[in-house]
Amino acid sequence: NVPMQQILEAERLGYDSVWTSEAYGSDAVSVASWILARTTHIRVGTAIMQMPARTPTCAAMTAMTLHALSGGRFILGLGPSGPQVVEGWHGVAYGRPLTRTREYISIIRKILARKEPVTHDGYHYQMPYRGKDATGLGKPLKSILHGDPALPIYTASISSKGIECAAEVADGVFPVWMNPERFDLFEESLER
């Protein structure tokens, strides 16, 4: 259940944001959409949308649409999830989570910028797709929706390398399982 009365009270009290999540049941986007439709000024973010569950273009289209419909109140929170959920629930290879994060956010930023048709040649993603069973008909495309390049993108991390990755490509980070009393474990990564 979505605790809408508590969310509305948080909005009335001036809270800045509320966040939705997903694992292997309810998805974060539907809940975020519901909250955005029932509120007027609190920002709503996903903490997190699992990257292996969606293509970067699908995540970008979703984020652009929610950001536009909400008057700029949507925050895109992404994460690589974990191998148990990625391979067990989504049925795709876990691969290289930091590489996926860099590629995924790079593609989304290209889509939001709309400077040119999007191309990407990476470990996890090829745009246009040229791999096995490709028809050869795919061509680089540019979003027909004008997204906001300033749309905030956050990413989750469970390691110091993940914090470094977030600092490179994201606007914020969710330091999952970070013990505030052991901030020193991440301090060097944050300073880079």
Positions of the model-derived regions?
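Active-site-adjacent structural elements that line small-molecule/cofactor binding pockets in enzymes
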Residues: 1-192
